[in-house]
Amino acid sequence: MMKRQKRDRLERARARGYQAGVVGKQKEACPYQCLDARGHWLGGWRDAMEGRGSGLFMK
């Protein structure tokens, strides 16, 4: 059960990073101190930035 809880937390961190990227926040806005969660947040943020670069999101 422990692994699932950790995975869910990391998936949530990635989703929040993605949302932050979609609205154009800087990567320094990452709220996570834990390296695992921070890495997932930044991964989501990078995915969103790539989407913005390819015109996936319009303001």
From Swiss-Prot:
InterPro entries: Ribosome_modulation_factor (IPR007040), RMF_sf (IPR023200). GO terms for cellular component: cytoplasm. Keywords: Cytoplasm, Translation regulation. Its main location: cytoplasm. The lineage of its organism: Bacteria, Pseudomonadati, Pseudomonadota, Gammaproteobacteria, Aeromonadales. This is Ribosome modulation factor. NCBIfam families: PRK14563.1, Rmf_CrpP_fam. During stationary phase, converts 70S ribosomes to an inactive dimeric form (100S ribosomes). Disulfide bonds: none annotated. It holds the Pfam family RMF. Belongs to the ribosome modulation factor family. Gene3D superfamilies: ribosome modulation factor like domain. It is found in: Cytoplasm. GO terms for biological process: regulation of translation.
